[in-house]
Regions:
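Active-site proximal loop and beta-alpha junction motif in alpha/beta enzyme cores
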Residues: 1-29, 35-177
């Protein structure tokens, strides 16, 4: 049930050129479709190590037999985080304002295959209650080059590795609202 599809467009041994598509657009990378492709390869040919050449960069993928089931994983392209400038339009589209944001996690743009904004909301009530216009958000995403999701999070406890994070990944490019 995920809206992205991976296509293997070329292959040289364990090195494969892979392209990803949502229902409405090509996207540079999709983790779910990467795992599904690795599992399909392992089921057809046996477990192994692969390199997927993607628009986002090379992604190392492994598929192994785990007690009769195929388990797959990958190492993402090098992640990058940068400051988010001029958030007023995005916040307005989400029905949020600066007072709704969690000061422990400044607004940022993150990359691990696709650029996307990360918005941390201070309270669970605002996190559960915000809404947005999918078409207007899609237009902003197209303008800003965000081909993946807009990630909105709420951290109820300490901001730390292993902590609980509530997340909504808004994906109008994939027709998920």
């Amino acid at each position: 049930g995920y809206p992205e599809t991976a296509y293997v467009t070329a292959r040289d041994g364990a090195r494969l050129r892979v392209r990803y598509f949502s229902p409405e657009a090509e996207v540079p990378f999709c983790g779910h479709a990467t795992i599904a492709t690795a599992v399909a390869l392992a089921e057809a040919e046996g477990p192994g190590e692969f390199v997927f050449e993607t628009t986002a960069g090379d992604v190392r993928v492994s598929a192994r037999d785990d007690g009769g089931r195929i388990a797959a994983g990958f190492t993402s392209v090098e992640p990058v985080v940068r400051d988010f400038h001029d958030p007023a339009r995005l916040l307005g589209l989400l029905g949020l304002n600066a007072d709704d944001l969690d000061p422990r996690m400044p607004l940022a743009e993150a990359f691990a295959g696709n650029w996307h904004p990360v918005v941390a909301v201070r309270t669970l009530e605002r996190f559960d209650g915000f809404g947005y216009d999918a078409d207007a958000l899609r237009a902003l995403m197209d303008e800003r080059g965000w081909t993946g999701t807009v990630t909105v999070v709420h951290v109820p406890g300490e901001v730390a590795d292993g902590g609980v994070v509530e997340a909504r990944n808004l994906f109008p490019v994939g027709d998920i609202t």
